[in-house]
A protein has these predicted regions:
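N-terminal interaction/assembly modules
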Residues: 1-116
Length: 116
């Protein structure tokens, strides 16, 4: 018997949802659900928001000249920004784990969109 992947178990899904919501409503106070990784979720969400300009500059430095971050889908922007935050500011987390977890979270959002 294999374990089913549940987005509720992936703190990155919550991170993406919080940052995406924040994109559309900057005035709303952020609240965080009870979760065993609540501290991690808060840290990534708040850190990504606080370091938004640094993260955007870092991303822009690595994009092709014909590609701009602001032209990309908003969910994709949030996923990339939060992953870059973890790469830069969470050195204890393996790069492999960060990539794997954000790929899983991305699949959740892609599959959710395709069923709409």
């Amino acid at each position: 018997m294999s374990l089913q992947y549940s987005p509720k178990n992936n703190p990155r899904v919550i991170v993406i949802q919080k940052l995406y919501g924040r994109y559309f409503n900057k005035e709303e106070n952020l609240t965080f659900p009870k979760h065993r990784f609540k501290k991690f979720i808060k840290d990534v969400v708040n850190g990504t928001i606080e370091r938004d300009e640094i993260i955007k500059d870092e991303i822009s430095n690595h994009l092709n000249l014909d590609l701009e971050l602001k032209k990309l889908d908003k969910v994709f922007q949030v996923i990339v920004k939060s992953a870059i935050f973890e790469f830069l500011y969470k050195p204890k987390i393996s790069t492999k784990i960060i990539i794997n977890e954000y790929l899983k979270a991305s699949n959740f959002f892609i599959n959710s969109n395709s069923s709409i």
